[in-house]
Amino acid sequence: MSRAYLAFTAKGEALAHRLAEALPGSVSRCGGDRTLKGWTAEHFAQDEALIFVGAVGIAVRAIAPHCRSKAADPAVVVVDEGGNFAVPLLSGCLLY
């Protein structure tokens, strides 16, 4: 399964790297040349799971333009920066 992690802060990026050790995937952080809109468009089309580390509202607004169908969309999960909570947003039920 191809996974991609996106963090919004340094703290979130550190957590994304720890998560990627257990569930391998690419890790990115918004900022500089890496925009939220660009990252989401790229990874929504190519990966089977997107894991955002940060606020649910940011993730929802980022994925909204790309959502097509339950069968076609990747799984999308948001993890809080503290690593305490994970909120599944899309399609996880169809992967298993």
Where are these regions (language model features)?
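N-terminal basic/disordered segments at the start of proteins
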Residues: 1-31
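Conserved small/polar residues in nucleotide/adenosyl-binding loops
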Residues: 96
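General beta-strand structural signal in soluble alpha/beta enzymes
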Residues: 27-32, 51-54, 78-79
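Short glycine/serine/threonine-rich phosphate/pyrophosphate-binding segments
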Residues: 12-15, 58-62
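Short Gly/Thr/Asp-enriched flexible loops that form oxyanion-binding sites at enzyme active sites
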Residues: 61-72
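Short, structured active-site "lid" loops
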Residues: 39-60
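Short, acidic/small-residue loops that bind anionic groups at enzyme active sites
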Residues: 71-92
